């Protein structure tokens, strides 16, 4: 039976091309038009509400229509909305840069502003390459990336990604990247457990660095969680050993904290848990609490000095975006950081993370099609499998995660899947009752789906 569309849905399907979507799916399952947000909830045209368990693609930290952030944005909009950022600056950007330098690892002293996560990755890749070109290491023209990595969808970012869903069609256009097998604690090739392993799988990276370090400019990694690959989580010792290898072989380390930064892993930045300082740190998403697009690339004085010279040397970093250092976004980011500090939200996230872990383990551990529930900080993931003992994956063509996602929406819960992995990444303001609803509804939906599937 064909669904009756609202006027806005009809106009949407007539003109809008949605991201990461097969638009033909929308004929049977049209986009939900959201009219307002409040706290962890999104409300559609019929005032049906949905608990935003994915923080609207991992960006929202302190709730939709947060009064404090909205007020800061409004006040700034009546003073200065934007200004060119070449030869000009403004107070919110200056204060934000100063604050980020104070919060991140000590060696990160310079802040370059960009618009979004993919843009930040492009900046870091270009900076690293140009640094080596300008310091006499002209043979360093390749990057090393991990299998199942995701760093964005521009061509440079895709070049260091490893998820075929996004990469495969563009392969002829991508950079010649060195690949190393990444960590997979659920299906560990060494049969180790992440709580007690010594990151033996770092040997895959070490082998590639030993062979190719003279031509590698940087290794890029998502610290602690390979998010888009299905929330693949690994221990901090892997990061520590990777930092040691990068130093040993004279290659940069780029930490892509776009998804995991700003408290998601239980510390303000994931790199803190390994006590490492990367050469570049890319930040976005939670930086503005889900309000406005903004990203930054943080780097060292050593990198900065390789570009600092007389104009005639042509060593400047000639990269820009029209909305670089947008005033509104910077002001919002300052308010987000103030909320973290004044309301001690890292402690809140850690406490709520333990509550979520307890509820989730009770709910999912004994379900026959759940291979594993895993969690780092305030990110939880349910890996659905065909066989718990062998960890055999479910057939991707059945789109089981997508089927569960649709059923959950009908129950008022937004849990957009990653293949056959369902995950929780809710706003930090979620209450205990809302968390209980999120987990119980997910369990009920999984059970309902597999009962229907088995007939």
Swiss-Prot record:
Binding site for pyridoxal 5'-phosphate: 117-118, 256
Regulation: Inhibited by KAPA at concentrations higher than 0.05 mM.
EC number annotated for this UniProt entry: 2.6.1.62
Catalytic activity: (8S)-8-amino-7-oxononanoate + S-adenosyl-L-methionine = S-adenosyl-4-methylsulfanyl-2-oxobutanoate + (7R,8S)-7,8-diammoniononanoate
Pathway(s) where this gene product acts: Cofactor biosynthesis; biotin biosynthesis; 7,8-diaminononanoate from 8-amino-7-oxononanoate (SAM route): step 1/1
Xref: InterPro entries: Aminotrans_3, Aminotrans_3_PPA_site, BioA, PyrdxlP-dep_Trfase, PyrdxlP-dep_Trfase_major, PyrdxlP-dep_Trfase_small
GO terms under biological process: biotin biosynthetic process
GO cellular component: cytoplasm
Listed GO MF terms: adenosylmethionine-8-amino-7-oxononanoate transaminase activity; pyridoxal phosphate binding
PROSITE patterns according to UniProt: AA_TRANSFER_CLASS_3
Self-association state and partner proteins as the record states: Homodimer.
Similarity comment text for this entry: Belongs to the class-III pyridoxal-phosphate-dependent aminotransferase family. BioA subfamily.
Protein purpose: Catalyzes the transfer of the alpha-amino group from S-adenosyl-L-methionine (SAM) to 7-keto-8-aminopelargonic acid (KAPA) to form 7,8-diaminopelargonic acid (DAPA). It is the only aminotransferase known to utilize SAM as an amino donor.
Family matches, as NCBIfam families: bioA, PRK05964.1
Protein name: Adenosylmethionine-8-amino-7-oxononanoate aminotransferase
Species, as recorded: Lysinibacillus sphaericus (Bacillus sphaericus)
Gene behind the chain: bioA
